[in-house]
Amino acid sequence: MFSKSVTLAQYDPDLAAAIAQEDQRQQDHVELIASENYVSCAVMDAQGSQLTNKYAEGYPGKRYYGGCEYVDIVEQLAIDRVKELFGAAYANVQPHSGSQANQAVYASVLKPGDTILGMSLAHGGHLTHGASVNISGKLYNAVTYGLDENEVLDYAEVERLALEHKPKMIVAGASAYALQIDWAKFREIADKVGAYLFVDMAHYAGLVAGGEYPNPVPFCDFVTTTTHKTLRGPRGGVILCRDNTHEKALNSSIFPSLQGGPLMHVIAAKAVAFKEALQPEFKQYAKQVKINAAAMAEELVKRGLRIVSGRTESHVFLVDLQPMKITGKAAEAALGKAHITVNKNAIPNDPEKPFVTSGIRIGSAAMTTRGFNEADARVLANLVADVLSNPEDEANLAKVRKQVTALCNKYPVYGA
């Protein structure tokens, strides 16, 4: 029998210590990785619940195990809420990740060797959109589009490649593209060649939910998203559709094809996050995320840095470090010493290797969750520039770190 009186610290002090250290790191560092965010205590409560004990293969009302009457309620709440949030007719909340959601979409209507047209990883796309190192690039014949000479998504190239290669599916969405994507234009191109249109909105989903980024659902055959990032939920995935045409194929692609039992504790946490995103205050959050990102980009330009695509229209942007003569890898390390967390990221036509890069990616979602406003964002951008202008000066790093600490103390991750 387990006892509720035995704490993790008592039973496994080594693990408890590592968790405590990570808690402290999150408090003491400003998080600027675009794919990260903080979840609410309610989300964590749901994810840490006894639902983790329950196996529930199948779907609500059609399970392969007994005792699922209450987890059916949990999953249906998540389904209903995410459908309302994005105006979808169909939702599958069982994918363990965005990558698995994407795999399920491909498997539902494609056969190995079919052609897909997706955004190049080198220009801001995602591994799962046909990169050669990913299963999507191994199973399918992947053709890629990219950015034009102004570092704007090249819709003319998308259309030219679509007409040339006649893909069965066109994939839109990105992991490192700052501007708004024209879903209607993609729909127009897809219709010209009779292709399915699939949008991966993982990075933008929270902005879509908050009304600050165009909703792809009305234009697409398939939409996927992660539930973390700008959506502020647990780590996981979702599949959405504007109608129920592919319901049977998608459901069977997830279970039994790609996954077994769903993670009911994570689905419960998703349901909480969807409820939070349906509240009026989430719209203000999404608006502030964009304001903060734009403010940071503006300040960095003033300090002599170049922003890929020239600006941001979302939560994310890439910084070209070549004018500073520093690599992304070195910048990530220097900023980390100053308690500013970013990730190195390739820029379009990057001459450096992927593990080195010539850029960094900056996102405003997590800092905005903490409460950072536009003025704070501008201060933070200048602190980033201070580090990048003198990345090996320990005194400079210590000075910036002290100012970062003051900002972090002003905005604790979890208040009283």
Swiss-Prot record:
N6-(pyridoxal phosphate)lysine carried by residues: K229
In terms of Pfam families, this protein maps to: SHMT
Cofactors, names only:
pyridoxal 5'-phosphate
Annotated residues that bind (6S)-5,6,7,8-tetrahydrofolate are located at L121, G125, H126, L127
Q: Which InterPro entries match?
A: PyrdxlP-dep_Trfase (IPR015424), PyrdxlP-dep_Trfase_major (IPR015421), PyrdxlP-dep_Trfase_small (IPR015422), Ser_HO-MeTrfase (IPR001085), Ser_HO-MeTrfase-like (IPR049943), Ser_HO-MeTrfase_PLP_BS (IPR019798), SHMT-like_dom (IPR039429)
Quick check: keyword tRNA-binding in the entry? no
Per its record, what are the GO molecular function terms?
glycine hydroxymethyltransferase activity; pyridoxal phosphate binding
Task: Tell me the domain of life.
Answer: Bacteria
PANTHER family, per this entry? Answer: SERINE HYDROXYMETHYLTRANSFERASE
NCBIfam families in the cross-refs: PRK00011.1
Q: What is this protein called?
A: Serine hydroxymethyltransferase
Q: Which organism is this entry from?
A: Neisseria meningitidis serogroup B (strain ATCC BAA-335 / MC58)
